[in-house]
């Protein structure tokens, strides 16, 4: 089958990444949002026609005039009407798919996705769009494929949720999977709060996009927070100027590392539970002893919120210190034997899509892999049993 008849769709809380099998990069990346006009007074704004339903880039452009909704929350589809608008936009506007009945589609899902959700995704693909065949893959497993691995722990931090997922021989391990409800969106909100405390005036919704851009350009993870605080209070080396769209110039200093600290200390954004390092350590130490070494040596970062400079080294430092304290009980000599490696692939922002594109390309002609329309018509949701076995 022709690769451009095999679609790969990675639905994230913040962004949809979509394209074709075998691609090195998504064809389109757009915000996972739907907007409806608050007032129907004008037909066009900035050359964009105002429609009853606006999706993706178009909705983002006119967000101040729209009632915005996000179909996914914490990685899981919550609004089915809206997600079909998002899929319509992706297939028709972005990928220019004229006839889905000639195509196959690989969708991604978060770990611990409710079974009813998976069923509804498949039902929609066959009954609304009429695809020939469908496959649903767990995002973390795709990340490892993109990295050329079958076993490892994926720390996947996107816009709406951070997951820590151990994968062994291509199978994710649900009972060891950890979910942390702190991700990109929370760091952006926290950065707004920190800048408001500094006396800068922002509108929390309209300026959200601007602050997200500041975060992506200037924020980093401190290796040693105390050291950075000392630097920030005694010098101006950390201060960077940023010009806002309205021409104002703001100075961003210690907020550059304070915002991302929410990943390590969720209480900063009023979320209970341990930080990403504690959840990662907990996930590995609760695994079978034989698997732990392989997990420590293959910790793979994935998702847009793993892009902060300094994150890999800080995470490694925190894991080593937890290992020293809780496993070695303070015996520093044992630390020399402890091997921990954090892999931070340069293209990790789109790792899930890349893994999906590799998998879809390898399997595009294998009927034993995909759920076909005929199987779905015959067995209904029973056809989903195929997905529990993943052999590549």
Swiss-Prot record:
CC per GO annotation: Arp2/3 protein complex; cell cortex; cytosol; polyphosphate kinase complex; pseudopodium
One of the record's GO molecular function terms: ATP binding
Compartments reported by the entry: Cytoplasm, Cytoskeleton; Cytoplasm, Cytosol; Cytoplasm, Cell cortex; Cell projection, Pseudopodium
PANTHER family (UniProt xref): ACTIN (PTHR11937)
CDD domains (UniProt xref): ASKHA_NBD_Arp2 (cd10220)
Keywords, alphabetical: Actin-binding, ATP-binding, Cell projection, Cytoplasm, Cytoskeleton, Nucleotide-binding
Family statement drawn from the similarity comment of this UniProt entry: Belongs to the actin family. ARP2 subfamily.
Name of the protein: Actin-related protein 2
Gene: arpB
Biological process terms in GO annotation: actin filament polymerization; aggregation involved in sorocarp development; Arp2/3 complex-mediated actin nucleation; bleb assembly; chemotaxis to cAMP; exocytosis; hyperosmotic response; phagocytosis
Residues bound to ATP: 158-160, 212-216, 303-308
Pfam families cross-referenced by the UniProt entry: Actin
Assembly and interaction partners: Component of the Arp2/3 complex composed of arpB/Arp2, arpC/Arp3, arcA/p41-arc, arcB/p34-arc, arcC/p21-arc, arcD/p20-arc and arcE/p16-arc. Interacts with carmil (via the region between the LRR domain and COOH-terminal proline-rich domain); carmil is required for Arp2/3-dependent actin nucleation. Arp2/3 complex, MyoB, MyoC, and the alpha and beta subunits of capping protein all form a larger complex with carmil.
Role of this protein: Functions as ATP-binding component of the Arp2/3 complex which is involved in regulation of actin polymerization and together with an activating nucleation-promoting factor (NPF) mediates the formation of branched actin networks. Seems to contact the pointed end of the daughter actin filament. The Arp2/3 complex is involved in organizing the actin system in cell motility and chemotaxis, in phagocytosis and macropinocytosis, at late steps of endosome processing, and in mitosis.
């Amino acid at each position: 089958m022709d690769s451009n008849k095999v679609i790969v769709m990675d639905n994230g809380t913040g962004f949809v990444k979509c394209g074709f099998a075998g691609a090195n990069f998504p064809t389109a990346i757009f915000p996972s949002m739907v907007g409806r006009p608050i007032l129907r007074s004008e037909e066009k704004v900035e050359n964009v026609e105002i429609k009853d339903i606006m999706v993706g880039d178009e909705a983002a452009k006119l967000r101040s005039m729209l009632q915005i909704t996000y179909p996914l929350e914490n990685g899981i589809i919550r609004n089915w009407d809206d997600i079909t608008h998002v899929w319509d936009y992706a297939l028709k506007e972005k990928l220019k798919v004229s006839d889905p009945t000639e195509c196959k589609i690989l969708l991604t899902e978060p770990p611990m996705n409710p079974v009813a959700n998976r069923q509804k995704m498949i039902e929609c693909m066959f009954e609304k769009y009429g695809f020939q065949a469908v496959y649903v893959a767990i995002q973390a497993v795709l990340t490892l494929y993109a990295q050329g691995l079958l076993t490892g722990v994926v720390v996947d931090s996107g816009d709406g949720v951070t997951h820590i997922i151990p994968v062994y021989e291509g199978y994710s391990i649900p009972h060891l999977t950890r979910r942390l409800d702190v991700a990109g969106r929370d760091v952006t909100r926290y950065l707004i709060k920190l800048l408001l405390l500094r006396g800068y005036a922002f509108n929390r919704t309209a300026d959200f996009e601007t602050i997200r851009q500041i975060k992506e350009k200037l924020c980093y993870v401190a290796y040693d927070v105390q050291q950075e605080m000392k630097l920030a209070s005694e010098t101006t080396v950390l201060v960077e100027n940023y010009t806002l769209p309205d021409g104002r110039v703001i100075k961003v200093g210690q907020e550059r590392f304070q915002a991302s600290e929410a990943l390590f200390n969720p209480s900063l954004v009023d979320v209970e539970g341990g930080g990403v390092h504690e959840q990662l350590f907990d996930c590995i130490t609760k695994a079978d002893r034989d698997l732990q070494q392989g997990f420590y040596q293959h910790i793979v970062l994935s998702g847009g919120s793993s892009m902060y400079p300094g994150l890999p080294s800080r995470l490694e430092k925190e894991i080593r210190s937890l290992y020293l304290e809780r496993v070695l009980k303070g015996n520093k000599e044992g630390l020399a034997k402890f091997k921990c490696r954090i892999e931070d692939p340069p293209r990790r922002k789109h790792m899930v899509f890349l893994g999906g594109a590799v998998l879809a390309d390898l399997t595009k002609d294998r009927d034993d892999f995909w759920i076909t329309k005929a199987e779905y018509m015959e067995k209904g949701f029973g056809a989903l049993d195929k997905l529990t076995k993943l052999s590549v």
